[in-house]
């Protein structure tokens, strides 16, 4: 009798989704902390921007590096979303059924999955806008330019929604990855899961607080500094040329 061949495609797709999700989550963790450099000073945020433009490697600014990085992250984002969407409810009826089941069972992990679906849907639109801006306007990043974008270009509300959705999605995803990859196995799986869940909630709270503080600082600078002349922040300690 001929053995039925096992279809390995679903497993491979799941591995790609998990891997790309891990990469994006780690990127978000670093990105929010780098953005938070504005909380230290304008000069610190400027120096972080210079680092990503390659100044400390080449001795000159190359904003195109940021465009390349944004395009790379965007490609990973599209790949991740394209694979993940196959697990989304196919219709509103399916969504309603899952929601009712989650509320009836009061199963927190099912609720977390629903949060990921909703935040993932939000990110598909909001995240795409942010990535497009970073790809097309890499030179407009800095204490004054970024703050002007938040206030003068009315991007503040969008960044607020993006912060909440991306942080929630990322850390819930990391929790579910830890569960899937066996990091919670041990003598007492229930205790391990509770500890990982507590860590997830603490990290979500931490990153949202840091992100909101940064957004508030950018908003303050955008309100108090007139960027209508388009003059970027000038470092007090560095003389930088742009290419």
Please identify what each model-predicted range represents.
Residues 1-243:
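Membrane-embedded alpha-helical bundles that constitute the cytochrome b-like, heme-associated redox core
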């Amino acid at each position: 009798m001929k053995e039925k061949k096992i279809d390995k495609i679903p497993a491979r797709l799941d591995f790609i989704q998990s891997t790309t999700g891990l990469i994006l989550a780690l990127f978000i963790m670093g990105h929010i902390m780098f953005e938070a450099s504005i909380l230290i000073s304008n000069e610190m945020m400027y120096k972080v921007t210079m680092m990503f433009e390659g100044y400390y490697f080449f001795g000159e600014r190359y904003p195109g590096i940021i465009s390349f990085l944004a395009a790379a992250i965007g490609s990973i984002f599209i790949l991740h979303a394209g694979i993940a969407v196959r697990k989304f409810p196919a219709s509103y009826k399916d969504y309603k059924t899952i929601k009712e089941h989650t509320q009836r069972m009061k199963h927190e992990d099912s609720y977390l999955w629903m949060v990921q679906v909703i935040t993932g849907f939000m990110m598909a639109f909001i995240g795409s806008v942010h990535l497009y801006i970073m790809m097309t306007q890499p030179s407009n990043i800095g204490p004054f330019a970024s703050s002007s974008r938040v206030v003068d270009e009315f991007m503040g509300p969008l960044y607020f929604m993006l912060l909440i959705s991306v942080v929630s999605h990322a850390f819930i995803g990391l929790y579910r990855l830890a569960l899937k990859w066996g990091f919670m196995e041990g003598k007492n799986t229930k205790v391990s899961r509770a500890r990982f869940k507590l860590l997830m909630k603490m990290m979500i709270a931490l990153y949202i607080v840091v992100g909101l503080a940064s957004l508030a600082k950018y908003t303050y600078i955008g309100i108090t500094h007139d960027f209508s002349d388009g003059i970027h922040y000038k470092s007090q300690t560095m003389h930088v040329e742009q290419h």
